[in-house]
Design a protein with these regions (language model features):
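Long, charge-patterned amphipathic interaction tracts in eukaryotic proteins
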Residues: 41-97
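Short, well-ordered helical secondary-structure segments
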Residues: 1-3, 8, 70-75, 95, ...
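N-terminal interaction modules that seed assembly of large macromolecular complexes
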Residues: 1-56
Length: 125
């Protein structure tokens, strides 16, 4: 079950049955899995993507990246994984689709430690 005990209790207090709470939990899990699939699909078949990532030795606001892969897994409402660029990689701690098949946002872990938007076209950032 996705919801912790406090949340389950609150949902019961507003009148939801355990079956309804389980159904809601299942919907959260399915939505998370769909989001992870959409995020991975964004990078598939693209040789180059653009981002608003803050990089130490770049004066540009928009960065260009060659991405080898995005590998994600889900647990309840968490999306985690690894984003591999051509010469380095970074853990992924969360993500969401902003504009379907055009702009996504990933929360990147150590070495970046920031939310970064990626787009198929630099003008979309």
């Amino acid at each position: 079950m996705h919801f912790d005990q406090r949340t389950q209790s609150a949902l019961r207090e507003v009148g939801l049955s355990m079956d309804e709470i389980r159904a809601a939990s299942d919907h959260v899990v399915a939505a998370t899995e769909d989001a992870a699939t959409d995020l991975e699909t964004f990078f598939e078949g693209r040789e180059t993507v653009y981002s608003d990532m803050d990089q130490a030795h770049s004066a540009s606001e928009i960065q260009e990246h060659a991405v080898e892969y995005l590998d994600l897994y889900t647990h309840a409402d968490d999306i985690r994984g690894y984003l591999r660029f051509d010469s380095w990689g970074v853990p992924v701690e969360a993500g969401r689709v902003i504009t379907e098949n055009e702009v996504i946002e990933l929360t990147l872990g150590p070495t970046v430690q920031d939310r970064v938007r990626f787009a198929s076209d630099p003008d979309q950032l």
